[in-house]
């Protein structure tokens, strides 16, 4: 109606004035057309927004994946949010996530840019955060061919074997001490040291474990700061609904800009040291701990998986490459752990490069796509048989796997942006867990029952347990030969 009125008024003017008036009204006409088109879009439902923040205040806690699951129960599995100045859609069902990540893979396979991410990734040069394009394709190809291909993962068995040989005397001493004293042991540092050593050996032929950076508190704090910066939606005023210049000024006044620069310089100096010493700092929190916590709470499952491992290994005293392929129940335990405790509960966000539709809703270009893998893993629609319970037997009746081919279980994502390190990570997890379960019996500390074990996690980008993993080891007769 407004456009018709403008047209009528335009043609009522003298002919010589019409081009001048039309030029002046052109921006108004374009805006009216866009508004009319936007009014016809079927946008996903979502909670009310507040000025400047949008919905950021609803995700301010240490467990945004839980907060988003609760919001989705009210607004549905396809939910619209505004995170500062960024439009976002959160997907909390397997069907919606599969439609977006596989059905529209090419349409939404780039990454969003934020002030913090841009700085600590050297201008979005990190392969995980780089936007889709020629640079990302070339870097990912190089990574997959030279380090993370199936051939390289298989060839890296020497690293896992060597790391166990190097660190096992230390682990022996600590664990035997605790076994003799009947005391619980905090496993996080041991597992982290082993994981770091394997990665360092594979990447550079050097070991760096408990005697180096994995015990360096400054290094760990720097990595924690980086993770917070990478996941901190709205931490920078530049990410809010403010003009860019105003956002930068606010960041300087609040000290955020100085903190961001300090974190970047810490990270940069560490990388310089890594280059000089041929060490690789890239590592996620150890994933084996989640397996052991759940296993300690389920003695039946623990006994069953240990029996399988010990039957396969026999009296060799150490898990060998051929043994891993025989451990079908161990693989089910790992699947169940990834279902309940995905390492990245909210998969790294994607961003739409063009207008798409998800579950009948319109999703415009430049919209961020978040997939709540944690909520999907506990969704009764996908897992009808007690989804909150740890039960590896649920995988006996199906072929569901974590490799990105089943919408119910996508802890590493799917499509073009699936985690390139999945195969290497799982080889390390299965190897480490098999050795720990073979060598020791594990039980909960005195006074701790399966019902009062804290399973809550914290963290925004990568989650870890709120409380340390503490278990009581008992030596198995062949485990330390």
Question: Whereabouts are the PLM-identified features?
Answer:
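Terminal signal-anchor or tail-anchor transmembrane helices
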Residues: 2-40, 427
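Cytochrome P450 heme-thiolate "Cys pocket" and heme-binding signature region
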Residues: 359, 396-429, 456-458
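Cytochrome P450 substrate-recognition site 1
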Residues: 40-62, 66-159, 182, 186, ...
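Conserved cytochrome P450 K-helix E-x-x-R motif and the immediately C-terminal K′/meander segment
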Residues: 56-76, 320-360
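Central I-helix of cytochrome P450 enzymes
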Residues: 195, 199, 204, 263, ...
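Cytochrome P450 heme-binding "Cys pocket" and the immediately downstream C-terminal segment
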Residues: 299-301, 422-464
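Cytochrome P450 heme-thiolate monooxygenase catalytic core
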Residues: 112-120, 154-293, 304, 319-322
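Conserved cytochrome P450 K-helix/beta-meander segment immediately N-terminal to the heme-binding cysteine loop
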Residues: 371-401
């Amino acid at each position: 109606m407004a456009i018709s009125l403008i047209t009528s008024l335009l043609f009522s003017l003298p002919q010589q004035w019409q081009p001048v008036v039309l030029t002046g009204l052109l921006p108004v006409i374009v805006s009216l057309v866009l508004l009319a088109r936007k009014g016809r879009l079927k946008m996903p439902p979502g909670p009310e927004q507040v000025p400047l923040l949008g919905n950021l205040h609803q995700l301010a806690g240490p467990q945004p994946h839980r907060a988003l699951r609760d919001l989705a129960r009210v607004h549905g599995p396809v939910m619209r949010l505004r995170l500062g100045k960024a439009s976002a859609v959160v997907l909390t069902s397997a069907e919606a996530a599969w439609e977006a990540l596989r059905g529209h893979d090419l349409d939404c396979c780039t990454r969003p840019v934020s002030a913090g991410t841009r700085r600590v990734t050297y201008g979005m040069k990190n392969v995980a955060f780089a936007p889709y394009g020629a640079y990302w394709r070339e870097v990912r190809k190089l990574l997959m061919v030279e380090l993370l291909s199936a051939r390289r993962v298989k060839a890296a068995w020497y690293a896992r074997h060597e790391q166990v040989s190097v660190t096992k005397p230390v682990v022996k001493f600590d664990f035997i001490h605790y076994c003799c004293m009947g005391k619980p042991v905090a496993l996080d540092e041991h597992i982290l040291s082993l994981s770091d050593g394997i990665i360092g050996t594979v990447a550079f032929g050097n070991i760096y474990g408990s005697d180096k950076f994995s015990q360096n508190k400054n290094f760990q704090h720097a990595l924690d700061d980086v993770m917070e910066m990478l996941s901190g939606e709205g931490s920078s005023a530049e990410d809010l609904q403010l003009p860019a210049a105003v956002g930068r000024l606010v960041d300087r006044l609040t000290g955020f800009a100085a903190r961001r620069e300090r974190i970047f310089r810490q990270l940069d100096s560490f990388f310089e040291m890594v280059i000089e010493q041929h060490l690789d700092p890239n590592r996620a929190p150890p994933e084996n701990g989640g397996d052991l916590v759940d296993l300690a709470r389920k003695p039946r499952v623990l006994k069953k998986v240990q029996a399988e491992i010990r039957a396969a290994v026999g009296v060799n005293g150490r898990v060998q490459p051929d043994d891993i392929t025989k451990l079908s129940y161990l693989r089910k335990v790992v699947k169940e752990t990834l279902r309940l405790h995905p390492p990245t509960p909210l998969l790294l966000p994607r961003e739409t490069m063009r207008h798409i539709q998800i579950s009948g809703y319109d999703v415009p270009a430049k919209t961020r796509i978040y997939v709540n893998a944690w909520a999907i893993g506990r969704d009764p629609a996908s897992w009808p048989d007690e989804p909150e319970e740890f039960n590896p037997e649920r995988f006996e009746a199906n072929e569901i796997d974590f490799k990105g081919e089943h919408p119910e279980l996508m802890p590493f994502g799917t499509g073009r942006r699936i985690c390139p390190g999945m195969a290497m990570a799982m080889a390390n997890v299965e190897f480490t867990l098999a050795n720990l379960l073979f060598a020791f019996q594990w039980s909960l500390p005195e006074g701790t029952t399966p019902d009062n074990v804290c399973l809550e996690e914290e963290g925004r980008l990568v989650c870890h347990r709120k409380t340390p993993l503490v278990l009581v080891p008992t030596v198995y007769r062949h485990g330390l030969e």
